[in-house]
UniProtKB/Swiss-Prot annotation:
Listed GO biological process terms: fatty acid biosynthetic process; fatty acid metabolic process
Reactions catalysed, as given in the entry: a 2,3-saturated acyl-[ACP] + NADP(+) = a (2E)-enoyl-[ACP] + NADPH + H(+)
Organism: Dictyostelium discoideum
Similarity-based family: Belongs to the zinc-containing alcohol dehydrogenase family. Quinone oxidoreductase subfamily.
Annotated keywords: Fatty acid biosynthesis, Fatty acid metabolism, Lipid biosynthesis, Lipid metabolism, Mitochondrion, NADP, Oxidoreductase, Transit peptide
Name of the featured protein: Enoyl-[acyl-carrier-protein] reductase, mitochondrial
Pfam families xref list: ADH_N (PF08240), ADH_zinc_N (PF00107)
Classification via CDD domains: ETR
Record: active site: Y69 (proton donor)
GO cellular component, one term: mitochondrion
Source species taxonomy: Eukaryota, Amoebozoa, Evosea, Eumycetozoa, Dictyostelia
Chief place where the protein resides: mitochondrion
């Protein structure tokens, strides 16, 4: 009888978690492996057992797998920078969280969100409200937060001001459009030409983009005429680099600021000397990981609250395409295809 109780007790202490691990650094299609592992319910006093609900596949996740990101995740680590989960159990020393709370990563270090269940310390988790859709919460830490900080941390923008950005149909770009619209800031949005160009133009304008043009059109006199009635942009947001970044700098107002937060073209940001000397164009860089390292939880909460408020007012939405965790390979492939205009989010319980 006692042995039977021990077996039952043992079964109750363990559950299986499926996770996506980095087997090697290289192409995401070959560098990952899916494993099942046992997760114990017996956790230390400062730890929290979390059942993960959703996690997106971000470009930064793919860069980490490739070994080309600014931070390195060791081989054998679980992939995924952000996501959302529900607290299932807390250690005796945990004071800020309780069962059934929703949590996202604190973003102080790599999280490893592509798993169905995991144990983290309380300091690695950040509580979020339950009235926001969980698929939205899973993406809040990176793209919307980046967009918010780009609009707030570099130039003092007021209603009626103008900004210009490339990669405008990225998730950061779509977030910038909506956050700017909510503040009465006009956006000039540059996107790549291609078979989905007209669909992307329609999508961006529906979200509030004022002007949407192709990379090629920006270089024409017709573009200058198109924007001639607008104030010159005070801020340019660059996620591409190369010639695209150069063109953004030429459109900026004198004393304007070009902020680079990505390099999709893998080409250097090259600004003509005349832009620096005669027009005092400011060149800045932004890396979200560094921002999280240097700012407090209270400052992070303020950013999240501002975004949550717009979501509640239906002034901000995320274009999301959900995929079952059991169909991870298809989701990974879709995330690497350009032009679909939606964030791929894993449903980690399916």
């Amino acid at each position: 009888m006692n042995s039977t109780r021990n077996i039952i007790s043992l079964v109750r202490r363990y559950s299986t978690s499926r996770s996506v691990k980095i087997a090697s650094h290289g192409s995401p299609s070959t560098a990952l492996k899916i494993e099942n592992e046992n997760i114990t319910d017996k956790i230390s006093n400062k730890d929290v057992l979390v059942e993960m609900l959703h996690a997106p596949i971000n470009p930064a996740d793919l860069n980490i797998i490739q070994g080309t990101y600014g931070t390195n995740v060791q081989v054998g680590g679980v992939a995924g920078m952000e996501g959302v989960g529900v607290v299932k159990k807390v250690g005796s020393g945990v004071t800020g969280l309780k069962e059934n709370d929703l949590v996202v990563p604190s973003m102080k270090q790599h999280f490893g969100s592509w798993r169905s269940k995991g144990v983290w310390s309380e300091q690695q988790l950040f509580k979020v409200p339950s009235d926001i859709p969980t698929e939205y919460l899973s993406t809040i830490s990176i793209n919307p937060t980046t967009a918010y900080l780009l609009l707030n941390d570099f130039v003092k923008l007021q209603q009626g001001d103008v900004i210009i950005q490339n990669a405008s149909n990225s998730m950061v770009g779509l977030s910038v459009i909506q956050l700017a619209k909510a503040r009465g800031i006009k956006t000039i949005n540059v996107i790549r030409d291609g078979s989905e160009f007209e669909d992307n133009v329609q999508r961006l304008k529906q979200l509030g983009g004022d002007i949407v043009v192709s990379e090629e059109y920006v270089r024409t006199p017709a573009f200058r005429k198109l924007i001639s009635d607008l104030p010159s942009p005070k801020l340019a947001l660059n996620a591409v680099g190369g010639q695209s970044a150069t063109e953004l700098s030429r459109i900026l107002a004198d004393n304007g600021t070009l902020v680079t937060y990505g390099g999709m073209s893998r080409e250097p940001v090259t600004i003509p000397t005349s832009q620096l000397i005669f027009r005092n164009i400011q060149i800045r860089g932004f890396w979200l990981n560094k921002w999280f390292e240097q700012h407090t939880d209270s400052e992070k909460q303020s950013v999240y609250d501002a975004i949550f408020d717009l979501i509640r007012k239906k002034q901000f939405k995320l274009l999301i395409e959900k995929h079952k965790f059991s169909e991870f390979d298809q989701a990974l492939l879709k995330s690497q295809q350009s032009g679909h205009g939606r964030k791929i989010v894993l449903d980690l319980q399916l």
